[in-house]
Amino acid sequence: VGPDSYKDLPNLLNEVDHNQRAVNVILSQSETYGDISPVRIHNNGISAFVSITRGCDNMCTFCVVPFTRGRERSRNPESILREIDDLYNKGYSEITLLGQNVDSYLWYGGGPKKDFKKASYDQKRNSKNFSHLLDDVASNFPKMRIRFSTSNPQDMTVDVVEIMSKHENICNYIHLPVQSGSDRILKKMNRQHTRFEYLELIKTIREIIPNCGISHDMITGFPGETERDHQDTLSLMDEVKYDFGYM
């Protein structure tokens, strides 16, 4: 059973009850689970994750997400705000806006992000990107701490960083995976940023939010990586001086 087949579970269970093989691994282009109120089995009553997107369109060569979660689609902002409001009323004080690539969030009425170019004039005019959503969440819930993860360097915008600096309740922390400090390896990974572009983004973040914490994801030993490529990664880490990272 695939992750988007939950609505078909009664039928699948019925097939199993009748000694039939039950399979449904079809990935939806519209399902965002926005109409489901999560049951938080392991909760501390303080912090919670709130999903804002599903899937991914980036097709990094080391990642299976596009094949297991499907095309990127964004959740209705009203549904997101309702879930956060429910958490606030239950006493939660911190939420993390969650997505494979939160900065790529784009709501224009529903559907995959790749189809946005086909949207009507009104849909495009009324669309919301991640900076709009982040601003809405921080403004509507000033007593809650707001975090978000994960950001992709190719989609992280100055607007998002400026919204962070505008609201005291948005934590000054960005998880910004680079994966490698070598342009040659980044190309093999099908990453859509270069070393220079990444470092320029880091510079911009620290100009706007000098005390911003920054963490990373890094892959070493990627197929074809040379000692020179590895040294490029080490030099990038030395230049950025991350607060912590996943390797």
Question: What is the predicted function of each stretch?
Answer:
Residues 89-227:
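Conserved SAM/AdoMet-binding glycine-rich loop
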